[in-house]
From Swiss-Prot:
It is found in: Cell inner membrane. This is Phospho-N-acetylmuramoyl-pentapeptide-transferase. PROSITE patterns: MRAY_2. Catalyzes the initial step of the lipid cycle reactions in the biosynthesis of the cell wall peptidoglycan: transfers peptidoglycan precursor phospho-MurNAc-pentapeptide from UDP-MurNAc-pentapeptide onto the lipid carrier undecaprenyl phosphate, yielding undecaprenyl-pyrophosphoryl-MurNAc-pentapeptide, known as lipid I. The keyword Nucleotide-binding does not apply. Its EC number is 2.7.8.13. Keywords: Cell cycle, Cell division, Cell inner membrane, Cell membrane, Cell shape, Cell wall biogenesis/degradation, Magnesium, Membrane, Metal-binding, Peptidoglycan synthesis, Transferase, Transmembrane, Transmembrane helix. It comes from the Bacteria.
Amino acid sequence: MLYWLLYQKLFPYFRPFRIFRYLTFRTAFASLTALLIALLIGPYVIEKLREFQIGQYIREEGPQAHQKKAGTPTMGGVLICIAILLPTLLWSDLSDPFVWIVMLSTLAFGAIGFADDYIKVVHRRNLGLTARAKMTYQILASAAIGVALVVLQGQGSYSTDLMVPFAKSLRPRFSIPALLHVPHLAYFAFIPFVIFVIIVIVGSSNAVNLTDGLDGLAIGCTIIAAGALTVLTYVSGHAVFADYLELQRMPMVGEVTIFCGAMVGASIGFLWYNAHPAQIFMGDVGSLALGGAIATVAVVIKQELLLPFIGGIFVLEALSVILQVGSYKLRKKRIFKMAPLHHHFELIGWSESKVIVRFWIAALVFALFALTTLKLR
């Protein structure tokens, strides 16, 4: 909105407004705007959640130290979504389709999480939507994103080819060649790509959801992942940097940098209230929205295979649950004292603060490694 008003409309009459053409300037201001929104309306949101008695239910089989957190306001992800989406609307070029894709992805997964949280609050138990219902909605939302990207591919704005880290010349195609030139069936050739998008986005949203078990853990890792994505999105949309780093040149994805910057600012603002001891929890509305947003950005900028490093802690947390469940079903034995992984470290004697900070450090190392792959091609 501000980009349209101040640059596209008023720039001819007031030349200093040319500064709004620069992506770095608008990204910085989107991040600051998101931070201020989160900080300023955070106390109001916390007060209203308490007023409506929207508190966290703590499962009895979890670590006993967590029982004191029962009743802490939850569904704080609403605050995160507002703080991300408003600055994106203000500072980005809204004619860019990729901006709408990442915003609508955030809204869709946030809505799924909101429904899940609402059911938990109403029934006062730690079970919301059924696993089947939640998975169905996530698959439908992810499939819609995949289809939208296939349409953009047909318009020449996107490529469904996969970019492989460390192998600049390797670009596997996610399509069925036999269908590409068949009238009325060409779009069906991209079904493998849509399936891949579903796996990436659904996996990421649930991985962030599993990580959200300690004060500030998931949001701190999100700040790091979103920061890495901000860099990757900027260079992917910058013609000179993309050519130099031998990335696929995608000029239109540059505007998504503003969304990533807003995600960083909103997450920092939320961490102010979510830091141990937390005054508010993000709930599923926050974790699913952030996980969906992170994965959608990665898909849009063709860095899906870097996502396990960009969000390394999220992957480890999800793997710990998969391994724990698989081991128990096959061998009737558990690998970890408790899954997800952060609870295992709590039960072996690490304090909550130590687990959080050490996981943040690991997340930073993963993200830095992801950024180094830009040059290792």
